[in-house]
Amino acid sequence: MRRLNVWVLLSAAILFLGTVITAQPAAFPEAFRVIGNIYWVGGEYGSYLITTPQGHILLDTGSTEMHDVIVSNVKKLGFKVEDIKIMISSHAHWDHVQGHAAMKKLTGAQVVALGGDAAALEAGQDNSAGGFPGMIAVHVDRVIKDGDIVSLGGTTLRALWTPGHTQGATVWMTTVQEGGKNYSVAFRGGEVPNDGVPLINNPRHPTVIEDTRMTLQRLKALKPPDLFLHNHHQNLGRPLDAALPVDSHCDTCMDAKAFTDMLARSEKNFTEQVRDAEAKK
């Protein structure tokens, strides 16, 4: 009888723990205004709505499952999803562009992408060094190159090509106004390949090492933006520059110092990865 009681208690404990685990999904920030005309509308992965009087720009659509989250968040903020006129992306990995096809079907928005990432979107296949899961193929209405401009309703974003994480990874740069002041804002593209990706003689991205080194040098040469918006939750655990008028719960927000520190870490880690890969040749 005692043994039976033990098993009953153990089974109950397992059921309780299972209930707790499944009942507590990861909590992500509600939709909110970041700064100026930039809003967070993402969920598990980053997605930003840049609003203008003539329609809106959506940066990244996340995974397929995140589509409904974005649609709901846009509505919660008081905007119409149908007013999204342009879709851009940080880079063509599934967790950032898998929702492009559904969003284009819903809104009719123009899809804009750079070089190799445009090819990935058109094919519905990841062509980065990692060869990750793909996405539903979507027509790219405008294929851009480094330095090109995307403009809508008085808002201008400039594309900075940063290959390495993907072939067409793009940092988008703009300026916003908040409280009568101008702030430079950059949206992360992707600096380095994912950990564990083959770097030597990679069949998908043969120049991944050279491209990544170029990207790191380009980003280091930039004047650090006032605000750098990451495309993943970072839980940075450090306060933002007090001069930045940004909500403290924005865990994708990085100030100029955090941006510089991130680049230093990325360069150090990538240098070590290349050294290890070359040692195994």
What are these regions (language model features)?
Residues 7-19:
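Bacterial N-terminal signal peptides
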Residues 19-25, 179, 193-281:
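Accessory terminal helices/loops
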Residues 59-61, 84-93, 112-114, 162-164, ...:
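Active-site neighborhood of phospho(di)ester-bond hydrolases with catalytic His/Asp-centered motifs
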Residues 65-67, 75-149, 246-257, 261-265:
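Active-site HxH/HxHxD metal-binding segment of metal-dependent hydrolases
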Residues 66, 92-98, 118-121, 167-170, ...:
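Active-site environment of divalent metal-dependent phosphoester hydrolases
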